[in-house]
Amino acid sequence: MSYMLPHLHNGWQVDQAILSEEDRVVVIRFGHDWDPTCMKMDEVLYSIAEKVKNFAVIYLVDITEVPDFNKMYELYDPCTVMFFFRNKHIMIDLGTGNNNKINWAMEDKQEMVDIIETVYRGARKGRGLVVSPKDYSTKYRY
């Protein structure tokens, strides 16, 4: 599904996407289109893109094609989703200890919509860190 979502092909395009969006959250999936984890995540992102279009815009970035942010954002996972609002990285507390990003494939579409909505609401209030509506600290346990 990655071909259906807009790709950013260089660091300048990524910066412009983050800078130019005034009223919506910029959701960027860093990873590879061929990676199974990314494919799962892309399918979820594509399926919710229409639902969240009023408060979020979704982009994909290939970390091999655009290595500019790999060190800065510690993009070592096969699939990483990050949130930005008005040129500011919005952190999200998912209960996993890593508040910078989502580094696994979300399988539940509604959960992803809820997270993006929570990020949007918190960011509009000026918060740099928002708390996820669901705690993912036990996601690997059960």
Curated annotation (Swiss-Prot):
GO BP: cell division; mRNA splicing, via spliceosome; RNA splicing, via transesterification reactions; spliceosomal complex assembly
Matches recorded under CDD domains: DIM1
Predominant localisation class: nucleus
Phosphoserine: residues carrying this PTM: 132
Description of post-translational modifications: The disulfide bond seen in structures determined by X-ray crystallography and NMR is not essential for protein folding and function.
InterPro entries reported in the protein's UniProt record: Dim1, Thioredoxin-like_sf
UniProtKB keywords: Cell cycle, Cell division, Deafness, Disulfide bond, Mitosis, mRNA processing, mRNA splicing, Nucleus, Phosphoprotein, Spliceosome
Disulfide topology: 38-79
Pfam family for this entry, one: DIM1
Keyword Nucleus: yes
Location within or outside the cell: Nucleus
Entry's Gene Ontology cellular component terms: cytosol; nucleoplasm; nucleus; spliceosomal complex; U2-type precatalytic spliceosome; U4/U6 x U5 tri-snRNP complex; U5 snRNP
Family membership: Belongs to the DIM1 family.
Disease tied to this entry: Burn-McKeown syndrome: A disease characterized by choanal atresia, sensorineural deafness, cardiac defects, and typical craniofacial dysmorphism consisting of narrow palpebral fissures, coloboma of the lower eyelids, prominent nose with high nasal bridge, short philtrum, cleft lip and/or palate, and large and protruding ears. Intellectual development is normal.
Binding partners and assembly: Component of the precatalytic spliceosome (spliceosome B complex). Component of the U5 snRNP complex. Component of the U4/U6-U5 tri-snRNP complex. The U4/U6-U5 tri-snRNP complex is a building block of the precatalytic spliceosome (spliceosome B complex). The U4/U6-U5 tri-snRNP complex is composed of the U4, U6 and U5 snRNAs and at least PRPF3, PRPF4, PRPF6, PRPF8, PRPF31, SNRNP200, TXNL4A, SNRNP40, SNRPB, SNRPD1, SNRPD2, SNRPD3, SNRPE, SNRPF, SNRPG, DDX23, CD2BP2, PPIH, SNU13, EFTUD2, SART1 and USP39, plus LSM2, LSM3, LSM4, LSM5, LSM6, LSM7 and LSM8. Directly interacts with CD2BP2.
Function: Plays a role in pre-mRNA splicing as component of the U5 snRNP and U4/U6-U5 tri-snRNP complexes that are involved in spliceosome assembly, and as component of the precatalytic spliceosome (spliceosome B complex).
Name recorded for this polypeptide: Thioredoxin-like protein 4A
Organism whose genome encodes this protein: Homo sapiens
High-level lineage: Eukaryota, Metazoa, Chordata, Craniata, Vertebrata
